[in-house]
Amino acid sequence: KFVNITGGEPFVRRDLEDIVEVMFKKSDRIVISTSGWHTDRIIKMAEKFPNIGIRVSIEGLSQKNDDLRGREGSFDRAMRLLLTLKEMGVKDIGYGCTVSNKNSEDMLWLYKLSRELGMEFATAAFHNSYYFHKDDNEITNKDEVIGNFHKLIEELLKDNSPKSWYRAFFNLGLINYIRGNPRMLPCEAGTANFFIEPYGDVFPCNGLEERYWNLPRCQPHRYPPPPHLGPSALCRGPPAGSRRSGGC
């Protein structure tokens, strides 16, 4: 039903248009997550596929974003891209912020900016992932970050849109995660969604080491399945109709 093409940076691939063309034959909605740096390639993609979704990663206002992303001018470039896509008539556009120790206050301003621009805004908390070889991410100024998430939730609940209310609940889940508590909703990785990496290995999500299928070989890996998938996960193949990455 939904495909999210992510990275790294998807737009460094020269065959990305071919991938999108194939995916649109399989799914009604394709969204590409990007830093927004390769503006010419992104605009070209939107011209060819007007129904494409674009989500740009923005980690704060101008200086904060550029510092965290390590590229001077990346905030301005991302904003110009989003405004250009909006002028082109692309509907499925927005940006997201991964909240860390350094940018939770800017998250609130980014939300307000999204309201003014009429664009989607999403949040995440930075975390560790086997797939990306990261194990030292930890939010240490928890009171400050949680306080800013509470402010965001209050703003979302003022909106008349049920979608904003669901996002408020999602952000409540992020607060729960930051506090180190068990997740509020069951993990559906490997059942309602899964992650395919460039070499064809299929993971329940990109946060787990266990992979359970390889598309080119069309055979299961003989690794123990993640506990919540049960012993039959290796023999049933990828869940039908699920193509988006996600998970814990």
Language model features with spans:
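Short, surface-exposed loop and linker segments with low hydrophobicity and enrichment for Pro/Ser/Thr
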Residues: I32-W37, N160-W165, R243-G246
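Radical SAM enzyme [4Fe-4S]-AdoMet core and its adjacent flexible, acidic
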Residues: E21-V22, K26-D28, K48, I52-E59, ...
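Cysteine-centered iron-sulfur cluster-binding motifs in ferredoxin-type domains/subunits
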Residues: E9, T191, S245
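Flexible mid-to-C-terminal extensions adjoining Fe-S/redox cofactors in radical SAM and related proteins
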Residues: P182-M184, D201-C248
